[in-house]
């Protein structure tokens, strides 16, 4: 009878272990779908253009965000965290478009939500454009999205980590890095938002071909307006 009880207990423990393992595997698989990702609310031109931005430097000044794109349109990166090596990788890749954007007459900008120490200064070598402060985080809304522990079990995040590490990018942990960033291509005047990419997980970059294609639409619209 004693042996039978031991066997039943052992079988019960095995069943619990297998069940727990199965639940963990199912949880990881589910976490790698988009089911648990923060929902995205698209920004509108009216929402973005009244955003108050600040220059970063010795004599900071405030201005409305629409000044960035009103005449020539703009490509704008909303940086999750300047010290993040994934953000530095994305900024470096985006900067490769600078010669083509210059030919189109489209400026390249970056937005940060905080200015801590020398973080923006250390970010600047990776980004070939001006950087401005959005202290209220408007460019990260209207509905700010966060990624927390979920990021540690997503395969895509680890693949992004590996890609950036192999690329030789380094970073630090200074500042807030859970609110996800994004990318905008905004047309001149009231042309509107031509491309909006919202980072769905750490290191989820905008497609550079799509960014350049959207920027080319600004050039055509500007030419039509001049005529």
Swiss-Prot record:
Keywords: Antioxidant, Cytoplasm, Redox-active center. It comes from Xenopus laevis. Involved in redox regulation of the cell. Acts as an antioxidant. Its main location: cytoplasm. Signal peptide: none annotated. Residues 13-111 are annotated as: Thioredoxin fold. It comes from the Eukaryota. The keyword Protein biosynthesis does not apply. One of its GO terms (cellular component) is cytoplasm. The keyword Cytoplasm applies. InterPro entries: PXL2A/B/C. This is Peroxiredoxin-like 2A.
